[in-house]
């Protein structure tokens, strides 16, 4: 199985606005203009072998041998105001992973927005309850509470169980996967740039490729076509990122800044 999953966040009217999702310099690095997003969608339509896939639960993966998945993290307001209509005009599904404590707050989607996405056939999943800075470093009981609280809130809004989620901040660990499984999640998306799907104690773990404001149009085409060189580049940079993450401090800040400049989140 070879899946290319792209991670998007928020779409802004222009580079100077900031009316969707979390605020701050780090968050801004992942926010695109709608013009850039429109270009990406056009390139995906031209270069993808098939239309983007919909993976809402484990059984969906059994039917997918390869393909492209579009995912959107955090639950910013642009999910319904700018993203959904663009996907729906092409009959494409999106995967919207929502930080449940922020539902209805300024800059984030409301319960009504989530129901609209669900009714339109998009996947609405969890992105934790509070978006902890490093979820993998929390006590296991607290990680489980993040998943349980988020899934319960979203399920109550949608009227159906939540089976998919993405890891906030990319801080994945085995405990993060196991607690997600215990909360009823069967498909967990990470930020590790891999096209492989692994099984961790009964939960499918799916890698993803980050899209930042510096990601070039050429790179979107290469990712869409799953070219070996671009996949290897993302893997190499991710390996360096993991090493420096463990060190933290100024070294991590410097590396993260350089990764953004290279267009790799």
Can you describe what each PLM-predicted range is?
Residues 27-63, 155, 181-201, 241-265:
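C-terminal domain-boundary segment and adjacent tail
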Residues 19-29:
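A solvent-exposed, charged loop/short amphipathic helix patch at secondary-structure junctions
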Residues 1-3, 15-21, 207-265:
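Membrane-proximal basic amphipathic "stem/tether" segments
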Residues 6-13, 23, 65-68, 76, ...:
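Metal-dependent polysaccharide deacetylase catalytic core of the NodB/CE4 family, i.e.
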Residues 98-103, 192-196, 210-212:
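Short, acidic/turn-prone active-site loops that include or flank metal/cofactor-
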Residues 2-12, 34-37:
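N-terminal anchoring/stem segment of glycosyltransferases
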Residues 1, 160, 183:
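Structured loop/turn residues at beta-strand edges in well-structured enzyme cores
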